[in-house]
Amino acid sequence: GDVYKRQDFGDEAGYTPLLPMFTLGHNFAPAHIHAGGLRYHGAGVIVSQLLKDNLMEAVDIQQLESFEAGCLFAQSEGIIPAPESSHAIAAAIREANKCKETGEEKIILFNLSGHGLIDMASYDKYLAGDLVNYALTDDDIQKNLDEIGDLAK
């Protein structure tokens, strides 16, 4: 919700202008996950505005579900997606499964933002069973936000 909506720096060092965004705090140190560009501390400014205006919704996709979706996509489409794209694929699969259960017909669109050829080691780790899911608690998030305070003051 809006509890996480605030202004924050776009970089860890705090050199950028303050940006309106949904953020975990520019001092956020993520777990060692294999999600490439998803290690960023906040949603981009445009995405944050779309979320605020209820024109889109954000969903949480754990990395194991993401890699499972990426493997399915690679097997069915012949394209190895980047881990970032695999999160979008997993969300599209979830939505398609909901439609299958309810009988609703929808056009489901996702963005394949890149290939995963640079990140094959992550797929190897997934296939070997060496990856685990990781989730932040609300307490972890609040602690991080308390550390940065209200930067807009």
Where are these regions (language model features)?
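Catalytic phosphate/nucleotide-handling subdomain of diverse soluble enzymes
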Residues: 91-151
